[in-house]
Amino acid sequence: MKNVYFLSDAHLGSRAIEHGRTQERRLVNFLDSIKHKASAVYLLGDMFDFWYEFRLVVPKGYTRFLGKLSELTDMGVEVHFFTGNHDIWCGDYLSKECGVIIHREALTTEIYGKEFYLAHGDGLGDPDKKFKLLRWMFHSTTLQTLFSAIHPRWSCLLYTSP
């Protein structure tokens, strides 16, 4: 029986994390170390600090991580990607190009005879009003459409400038 792995909140690309490339390499090295032992990997949100996927443009970077996800799925390892509050704007790039299974909602599933409730967790509990407003804004299709109308060159400045 192969193992199932759960990871979350890597926040790849975060300005708050010094040596971001080193962090990505460590994550990739870990995934490489489990690739022959894993039947599935569940990425439970916020793997990226910010991921906004335009129709024809995805954020630059993360090459090693995305390549490793592709390698895992090519080997037959199921990779499940749950959107978190930092990467909810994930479209179909990760599924089409890397073969990952995207989950936008919580999932109850059975793994080796045990039932698991899997979610990122940002919406669990009793959030305050500010959080509810922010969550509504992030999930608003109207606001996403408006943001998508901004050229990626300019919109990326909103989340990459200090």
Give the label of every model feature segment.
Residues 2-3, 7, 12-111:
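Core catalytic region of metal-dependent phosphoesterases/phosphodiesterases
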Residues 6, 115-119, 125-126:
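Short hydrophobic-aromatic micro-motifs
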Residues 17, 25-28, 121-153:
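Binuclear metal-dependent hydrolase catalytic cores centered on His/Asp/Glu-rich metal-binding motifs
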Residues 159-162:
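Conserved small/polar residues in nucleotide/adenosyl-binding loops
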